[in-house]
Regions:
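Juxtamembrane/disordered regions of integral membrane proteins
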Residues: 1-290
């Protein structure tokens, strides 16, 4: 039954967001927003009705169900990533296999440029976020370091991790935004996603073997959420500088310019609504329920 429901939810995701997904990054963002919506729709509304229980939309009930909120967000993130992967396979086999629709650069060169720009952007984002993490006392505890050398060791590990995460940003969010104003919100969303996936899930699993999705645990990590937002915005801003310069060089070819024009999001795209919904609730819910 669980897998049938998951299949149905995945099909609904594809029907609703097919036109809005342009790559891995936007698909992950829509998955995050979809997961938050499912939490409101399922555990807070439909499940009590099916169980013939009174609806309880109080903050106390939300706090009690905070763990399921994180679970739905992680589910939406994974759903969006898998959907984008399958979509890219379809595009590669049935669209870009036509010589007229091939990308101007090969897959290997695209990968190398993405991780190069992303790694540099991640380093800048890591440097920019250091003051916030240090001021809130989070930096010495990065990767579980809590010794007299924790500050130095935490900073070094933080920068290495920032470079690695920046590389993933380059791979996932390349060609998602034509301008800095449209790209930085994607960076903020990327930071929120990594806060739920990293400090709230993966890091506890690596250190202790279990994760803690209680509202109290999220409240203790709120300072790092601010750091992740700053990191995401700075990473996106830095990444867009070489990406836009490279695009200006590509647009000198009229054929590539016409193709890039078709790939731009049309006026009236729902992406700003996603930023408002996912960023607003993704940040406010841990604050209000914690």
């Amino acid at each position: 039954m669980h897998f049938l429901v998951a299949l149905l939810i995945g099909s609904i995701f594809g029907i609703l967001f097919q036109r809005d997904v342009r790559g891995y990054g936007s698909s992950m963002g829509w998955g995050l927003g979809f997961g938050i919506f499912l939490w409101f729709f399922g555990p807070l509304t439909v499940f009590p009705v099916v169980g013939r229980q009174p609806l309880d939309w109080s903050a106390e009930q939300g706090t009690a169900l905070f763990g399921s909120l994180v679970g739905y967000i992680i589910y939406g993130f994974i759903l969006g990533t898998i959907y984008a992967f399958l979509d890219r396979i379809w595009v590669r086999l049935f669209i870009q296999s036509d010589p007229l629709n091939r990308e101007p650069e090969g897959l290997g060169l695209h990968f190398l440029r993405s991780i190069e720009w992303g790694g540099l952007a991640g380093l800048v984002g890591g440097l920019v976020s250091i003051p916030v993490l240090a001021a809130t006392g989070i930096l010495p505890k990065i990767a579980g370091l809590d010794t007299s050398f924790g500050g130095i060791g935490g900073t070094i590990i933080h920068l290495f991790v920032s470079v690695g995460i920046g590389m993933t940003y380059g791979l996932l969010f390349r060609n998602e935004a034509p301008s800095i104003g449209l790209g930085v919100p994607w960076g903020f969303l990327f930071g929120v996603i990594w806060w739920y996936v990293g400090p709230l899930t993966l890091l506890p699993l690596i250190l202790t073997g279990v994760y803690d999705w209680r509202a109290s645990a999220a409240a203790a990590l709120l300072p790092s959420l601010i750091g992740h937002l700053i990191y995401g915005g700075a990473t996106a801003f830095t990444f867009l500088l070489p990406e836009r310069r490279y695009k200006r060089w590509l647009l000198l070819d009229p054929r590539i310019a016409a193709r890039e024009e078709r790939r731009l999001r049309p006026v009236g795209t729902p992406a700003p609504a996603l930023w408002f919904f996912a960023l607003g609730l993704g940040v406010l819910l841990p604050i209000l329920l914690g």
